[in-house]
Amino acid sequence: MSTVFNTNPVDVLNEPMFFGSGLGLARYDIQRHRVFEELIERQISFFWRPEEVNLMMDAAQFNKLPQYQQNIFTNNLKYQSLLDSIQGRAPSAVLMSLISDPSLDTWVATWTFSETIHSRSYTHIMRNLYTDPSKVFDEIVLDEAIMKRAESIGRYYDDVLVKTREWENAKDMVEYYKDQGLILADKDVEQRAKRDLMKSLYLCLHVINALEAIRFYVSFACTFNFHKNMEIMEGNAKIMKFIARDEQLHLKGTQYIIRQLQSGTDGDEWVKIAQECEQEAVDIFMEVNRQEKDWAVHLFKDGDVPGLNTNSMWSFIDYLTVSRMKQCGLPCPITDAPVKHPYPWIREYLNSDNVQSAPQEVELSSYLVAQIDNDVDDKVMMSFKKYF
């Protein structure tokens, strides 16, 4: 992992996801983790551009909304802009130097690129809704309610960067002492630095997972509600549907990584780290739960919108938290979460397979590209001979 291209032969089927031999040839014919290849193919098939969605009607409808409802939409847009500003660079900048599985390496690059499309989407929306979109962007870093969430995410990414430097420094020091024929007093310095980094990485993965699993969904609910229950702003709902579809892939990826580490696929040390960090991982999720509830209060401080209110949004957040924590192997202290989905109608926006539309009536958001199976064997060819 100290070189951009490992020239030594590597058995990719036996490489761990992190801290392995270092990446060499980018190859996609074999994978230790088929899930990552499936996510890559799916994400590529989802490729879209926000400019493809016309927002002229949305702009006219937005301008007719009461000011407090405009504020709800704008604040959510600001918050999502911040989240995807982080996710548009942090996974690549922080995780990729530690990755040793080729398919995971490509998945993180693909995932991060898709987040930049999300960021561009917010610019597309703002250009269409506001006379001065730059003013809206400039206000984001001045919003305390938004920025405290950035700090709670960024500090875990930053800690991985710090721990990575400390591990690299420890390796260099051990190598220097060895080359000089000197005896290093602290013989465990490198291993200790690596384990500290592993713990930091494990917790950072939970922060990423919580971000993808919960943080976007208050904003999603509000945006989809404008279309579903208020019957306005269809274009924005379609863009957010594209984004939500991508985020579910990203969530599946982080959940898979976490569960593999917890199960010991990459070694028993990860199992021990998962056990040691379980309470801190639970605390991470519960902090996200509290912050999103605070965000709901902030959004609806001047009034509710048809179909949504603070109480139902809190129930939605609890419902998501219990489900998402279970999916990543964590116990959840919430005991009074609703059993039934508080917003069952949102599923039609989160699952693109649920909605069927006539192509001549609406712009399809469920159209996939690059979905042809090119694997044709001799048996398939023989079956076609009867037609010739």
UniProtKB/Swiss-Prot annotation:
GO BP term, pick one: deoxyribonucleotide biosynthetic process
InterPro entries to which the protein is assigned, alphabetical: Ferritin-like_SF (IPR009078), RNR-like (IPR012348), RNR_small (IPR033909), RNR_small_AS (IPR030475), RNR_small_fam (IPR000358)
Keywords: Deoxyribonucleotide synthesis, Iron, Metal-binding, Oxidoreductase
Pfam families: Ribonuc_red_sm
Residues at which Fe cation 2 binds: 115, 212, 247, 250
Enzyme class (EC, first level): oxidoreductase
Binding site for Fe cation 1: 84, 115, 118
Listed PANTHER family: RIBONUCLEOSIDE-DIPHOSPHATE REDUCTASE SMALL CHAIN, RIBONUCLEOSIDE-DIPHOSPHATE REDUCTASE SUBUNIT M2
Name listed for the protein in its UniProt record: Ribonucleoside-diphosphate reductase subunit beta
